[in-house]
């Protein structure tokens, strides 16, 4: 999928780029796989903001995605590759021979008309889903389960992939997109190949209006606020923050502060930490 640039007819489009959507083969989604999607505006059940800079945006329907890939030994034909506004990756519509339809994350190289399978006996082919125990070492994979039967949770965004490094007893060693090497149960499933839409990272938003359509509101600098709103606020003119290092609106260190819980139960499954 390529990137389209524009002539600088206005300041907004001078730097803006968009995807050419060459991989998309169908515009209208499958209605039976749509569900309403309500917006929270970053508020919790009490109406308090728990995530800042959220609100507005265009209306969307949620596409029900099959992350579990548990329909074993039944052939499925790739009917179309579609755009999904809820994620960076594209999605592929599968028509199973028994009449059922499902969406999956579209991997790189998946073509309309191909037949794909799920299950331990499936071939090592792009789009097929197998348990890690049945996948050869060195294979590029995505949509990886953390717990058997729970559904894929790792390597699902555009261009992402992981690699199966080794198998040791009950666990497989998988190198994640972050560079972390982690133990995962060999019964967990993964899909062969790399997630498609690789050029997503090269898209330049270009103007604030596109961010607003995505449901993202402006981020105000703390130094532009009053002292009762932010630790960086106040002062005459453009004042320094008056602290050794920047902090969050709640006074926590803002840069390089580790937020992962210490002594977390899953730490024992991390063989090599992620790149920093």
UniProtKB/Swiss-Prot annotation:
InterPro entries in the record: NA-bd_OB-fold, Rib_uL2_dom2, Ribosomal_uL2, Ribosomal_uL2_bac/org-type, Ribosomal_uL2_C, Ribosomal_uL2_CS, Ribosomal_uL2_dom3, Ribosomal_uL2_RNA-bd_dom
One GO CC annotation: large ribosomal subunit
BP GO annotations: cytoplasmic translation
Any GO MF annotation of the entry: rRNA binding
Keyword line: Ribonucleoprotein, Ribosomal protein, RNA-binding, rRNA-binding
Chain intervals for the UniProt region annotation (Disordered): 219-276
NCBIfam families reported for this sequence: rplB_bact (TIGR01171)
Free-text function comment from the UniProt entry: One of the primary rRNA binding proteins. Required for association of the 30S and 50S subunits to form the 70S ribosome, for tRNA binding and peptide bond formation. It has been suggested to have peptidyltransferase activity; this is somewhat controversial. Makes several contacts with the 16S rRNA in the 70S ribosome.
Protein name per UniProt: Large ribosomal subunit protein uL2
Provenance organism: Alkaliphilus metalliredigens (strain QYMF)
Gene name as annotated: rplB
């Amino acid at each position: 999928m390529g990137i389209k640039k524009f002539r600088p007819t206005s300041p907004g489009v001078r730097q803006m780029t968009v995807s050419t959507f060459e991989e998309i083969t169908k515009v209208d989604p499958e209605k039976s796989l749509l569900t309403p999607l309500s917006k929270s505006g970053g508020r919790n059940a009490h109406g308090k903001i728990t995530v800042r800079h959220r609100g507005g945006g265009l209306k969307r329907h949620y596409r029900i995605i099959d992350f579990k890939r548990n329909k074993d030994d039944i052939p499925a034909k790739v009917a179309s590759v579609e755009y999904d506004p809820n994620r960076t990756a594209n999605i592929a519509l599968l028509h199973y021979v028994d009449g059922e339809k499902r969406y999956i994350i579209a991997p790189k190289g998946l073509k309309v008309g191909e037949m794909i399978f799920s299950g331990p006996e499936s071939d090592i082919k792009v789009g097929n889903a197998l348990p890690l125990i049945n996948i050869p070492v060195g294979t590029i994979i995505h949509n990886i389960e953390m717990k058997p039967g729970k559904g894929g949770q790792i390597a699902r965004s555009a261009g992402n992939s992981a690699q199966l490094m080794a198998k040791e007893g009950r666990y497989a060693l998988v190198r994640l997109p972050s560079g972390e090497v982690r133990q995962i149960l060999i019964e967990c499933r993964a899909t062969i190949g790399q997630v498609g839409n690789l050029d997503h990272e090269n898209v330049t938003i270009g103007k604030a209006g596109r961010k607003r359509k995505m449901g993202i509101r402006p981020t105000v600098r703390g130094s532009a606020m009053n002292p009762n709103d932010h630790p960086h606020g106040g002062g005459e003119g453009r004042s320094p923050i008056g602290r050794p290092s920047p902090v969050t609106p709640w006074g926590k260190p803002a840069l390089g502060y580790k937020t992962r819980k210490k002594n977390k139960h899953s730490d024992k499954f991390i063989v090599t930490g992620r790149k920093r």
